[in-house]
Design a protein with these regions (language model features):
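Interfacial juxtamembrane loops and adjacent helix segments
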Residues: 101-143
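Alpha-helical membrane-protein architecture signal
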Residues: 84, 97, 131-139, 177-180
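Flexible juxtamembrane loops connecting transmembrane helices in multi-pass membrane enzymes
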Residues: 39-43, 56-95, 106, 125-129
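Phosphate/oxyanion-binding loops and surfaces in catalytic or ligand/nucleic-acid-binding neighborhoods
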Residues: 44, 90, 94-97, 107, ...
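Alpha-helical transmembrane segments of multi-pass inner-membrane proteins
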Residues: 1-51, 55-70, 143, 147-166, ...
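A juxtamembrane structural motif centered on a specific transmembrane helix
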Residues: 166-171, 203-228
Length: 228
């Protein structure tokens, strides 16, 4: 009976996953498509890790998909390239600690104007706009908190990978892949402007670190503090 129940859960989960994939493709969300493709790339390499041709074929397909996503909405992609170029110039002016929270919205237009003063009117000139986010969460961290902030994010990622490898299980694998998907999506969009993303990320972190969280709360000092 338990086996039948688990099989039913797998079927339902597979059906929901299939519906989500179709919905993402139909929505033409390039960041979503790349996230799904990256997870598929990881799963294929885990299943056929001993076959080198699978790795090369997966890399080729991923590169073709990336190129296809660019040409799908070329003007939009070029607009983001302009935003990233101007954002990199902002990072160069305050690389270690960043410009502070809200700096992109406050100062981006100045850097965009400087870019066109330096390079003149080019293919990006028709795509220039007043934007409120760099369309890349990692670039956003660099702008707000500099390399110090980015190093803290990388330290957290390293810690989560360690926690996953130390106590691997199906539940943690799902949480880990969910975070990878969010991480890939964050390269191309403003993922963390939505509360839902924060909630999912927080839950995944709890799942990955639950053994260590349990140790913290079973520590005598913490227990006595809570009791007080």
């Amino acid at each position: 009976l338990l086996s039948d129940s688990n099989k039913y859960i797998r079927y339902v989960g597979g059906l929901i996953g299939f519906v989500i994939v179709i919905a993402v493709i139909l929505s033409q969300s390039r960041a979503g498509i790349m996230s799904i493709a990256f997870i598929c790339f990881i799963l294929l390499n885990m299943k056929f890790f001993h076959k080198r041709w699978v790795k090369y074929l997966s890399l080729l397909c991923f590169a073709l998909l990336l190129s296809g996503c660019y040409w799908m909405k070329k003007d939009s992609a070029d607009g983001r390239l302009l935003i990233w170029r101007c954002s990199v110039s902002m990072v160069k002016d305050a690389p270690w600690l960043g410009h502070g929270i809200g700096s992109f919205e406050a100062r981006y237009m100045d850097y965009q104007a400087d870019y066109f003063r330096q390079y003149g009117l080019n293919r990006y000139s028709m795509l220039a706009d007043n934007v409120k986010h760099p369309f890349n969460e990692y670039l956003g961290v660099l702008l707000n908190f500099g390399f110090v902030g980015l190093l803290m994010i990388l330290a957290l990622i390293t810690l989560l990978i360690y926690c996953y490898k130390k106590h691997p299980c199906a539940e943690k694998r799902i949480a880990f892949y969910s975070l990878i998907s969010i991480g890939v999506f964050s390269f191309f969009s403003y993922t963390f402007t939505y509360p839902f993303t924060w909630i999912v990320t927080f839950l995944c972190i709890i799942i990955l670190t639950k053994e260590y969280i349990a140790k913290v709360f079973t520590c005598p000092i913490i227990k006595n503090t809570v009791c007080i």
